[in-house]
Amino acid sequence: MGSTDTEDQVRTIDVGTPPERYARGWHCLGLVRDFADGKPHQVDAFGTSLVVFAGEDGKLNVLDAYCRHMGGNLAQGSVKGNTIACPFHDWRWRGDGKCAEIPYARRVPPLARTRTWPVAEVSGQLFVWHDPQGSKPPAELAVPEVPTYGDPGWTDWVWNSIEVTGSHCREIVDNVVDMAHFFYVHYGMPTYFRNVFEGHTATQVMRSLPRADAVGVSQATNYSAESRSDATYYGPSYMIDKLWSAGRDPESTPNIYLINCHYPISPTSFRLQYGVMVERPEGVPPEQAEQIAQAVAQGVAIGFEQDVEIWKNKSRIDNPLLCEEDGPVYQLRRWYEQFYVDVEDIRPEMVNRFEYEIDTTRALTSWQAEVDENVAAGRSAFAPNLTRAREAASAESGS
């Protein structure tokens, strides 16, 4: 085949099919405080419905939502003692999945047992373990603590969530390697970008500068002040991101821990959750620190809504066409695949250590020229998707 024939070939998109299977691993359902109120809570996840409740002993439990008697929804019932009572016939289920009592019956049938989900409470967050093979969670896959949680020098979590429809949760995981989208979607300018995948973790190390043409987007005034981000996925759906800055006002850009997590609802929908805690600047009272955290969370919300706007309108693509300055998308997806196969089918290349650093030289030259041109012309990098993202973030926060 000649070069002309090759150049005339049209690249087609392979949209593939989202997996029907849900990822094995720990998934964060939200904050403990939001579930520990003595009421049942319904969570739609993993293609089914769950009920989360805390009994009189304060222990949080997660069961299948539908009663094994006649299918009543336990999330519509009530907590009685250390059981969840079905609203249909008052069958009462313990956190271990056994039916403890049927008030109108002489005895409880021996087979009266429902599915219970392994849970963990870490850094004020509630996790459930999902495994299609039914295995117990291995100790080496435990979710790590956020080191500053509970530290009086830091705020508590400011937490938000978005239901994303029409997309598989692989879309958000792809962002781990996507350096360029931080410039075009989030109005940052990455100066250093590196990935490390090993075992069940995937890490992104990024250093970036604010864009001087991002008028109305960035609050930065010192455009040489570097932002730093060390972000790691622990398993398929839970990321801890440490964010800090050099040469900035600690009140406007404090040290931050950001949680970026999600759980699948269906093969084409998921609930995206994100939380922030900030270090209280010296001399700043707790109330003001909470206001700072709220402001940071609002900025984070806009950033995630920018991503959602892209996902809502893009095609699924299993064969992305990449250039040299793109990140290791295929290697990341190979790492991600380990959570969708049986444990015995995990291949060494899915979990072996892999490192990749993007050469940012060409990108920075191009981006700086674009920024300089916009500044000289008095143009802003402000884009329509930012307006939509701000409106969505405002609606999510109820403001």
Curated annotation (Swiss-Prot):
Record has Zinc-finger as a keyword: no
Cofactor: how and how many bound: Binds 1 [2Fe-2S] cluster per subunit. Binds 1 Fe cation.
EC number of the protein: 1.14.13.-
Gene induction: By cholic acid.
Record-linked Pfam families: KshA_C, Rieske
Required cofactor(s): [2Fe-2S] cluster; Fe cation
Residues where Fe cation binds: 175, 181, 186, 307
InterPro entries: Cholesterol_7-desaturase, KshA-like_C, Rieske_2Fe-2S, Rieske_2Fe-2S_sf
Domain Rieske: 26-128
GO BP annotations listed: cholesterol metabolic process; lipid catabolic process
Keywords: 2Fe-2S, Iron, Iron-sulfur, Lipid degradation, Lipid metabolism, Metal-binding, NAD, Oxidoreductase, Steroid metabolism
Class in the EC hierarchy, top level: oxidoreductase
UniProt key word Mitochondrion: no
Xref: Gene3D superfamilies: Naphthalene 1,2-dioxygenase Alpha Subunit, Chain A, domain 1, Rieske [2Fe-2S] iron-sulphur domain
Residues the record lists as binding [2Fe-2S] cluster: 67, 69, 86, 89
UniProt superkingdom: Bacteria
Function: Could catalyze the introduction of a 9alpha-hydroxyl moiety into the ring B of 3-ketosteroid substrates.
Oligomer and partners: Homotrimer. The two-component system 3-ketosteroid-9-alpha-monooxygenase is composed of an oxygenase component KshA and a reductase component KshB.
Protein name: Probable 3-ketosteroid-9-alpha-monooxygenase, oxygenase component
